Amino acid sequence: IEAAHGRAPAVATGVKRSNPENIVFTYQGDGDLASIGMAHTVHAAARNENITVIFINNAIYGMTGGQMAPTSLPGQITQTSPYGRDVNHCGYPIRVCEMLSQLEGPEYLARVTVNNVKNVKNAKKAIKKAFENQVNGKGFSLVEVLSSCPTNWGLTPKKALEWIDEKMIPYYPLGVYKDRSLQGKED
């Protein structure tokens, strides 16, 4: 099923509630989820809807020409911020996992990346956990994947992978931001 831009969590909620046995997930970019779809994402998380959200954060509107996204980094140059994102004018980037972790509803929130083999393995584990949570009826899971956009970043693919390490991860730290299955357990 294809949903209107930003509305995937609302559509996924309807599909899951009407067909609870189905595995339902959304695959959304940062322009979709963190901009026009933010309200739908927040409320699905707050209600702990039993869906899985895969959120691709490449810090740019990659499919429409490279405009500044809600997740573009401070100082990041884009088509609509040719001198770099000015936080005094455009505000700060939205850290989705950190924001959603303040809600009581979500079952699982994690941020991963896919810029090397080790990180791909960790991403697979996080995505598997998110789908297992849904299968087991535990509720809302979101996995944010820091991803490259070499074309719109104006970088080679190799440099784009390095940019994730050098620029994105310091601003968007990797890790599990919420896992209710671990609450109350000692490490």
Specify the residue positions occupied by each region the protein language model found.
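Short, hinge-like loop/turn segments at secondary-structure boundaries
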Residues: I1, A44, A69-L73, K159-E162
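Thiamine diphosphate
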Residues: I1-G62, K125-K129
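Conserved thiamine diphosphate
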Residues: E21, A69-N136
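Short, well-ordered, mixed-charge alpha-helical segments that flank or form enzyme active sites
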Residues: L33-I36, I60-G65, V117-K121, C149-W153
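Active-site-proximal loop->helix
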Residues: M38-H43, M63-I77
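Compact, aliphatic and Gly/Pro-tolerant "microcore" segments centered on a short helix or tight beta-hairpin
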Residues: V53-I54, G66, L100
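Short, structured patches in soluble enzyme cores that scaffold and shape functional sites
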Residues: F55, R111-T113, E144-S147
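Flexible, low-complexity linker and terminal segments
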Residues: V135-D187
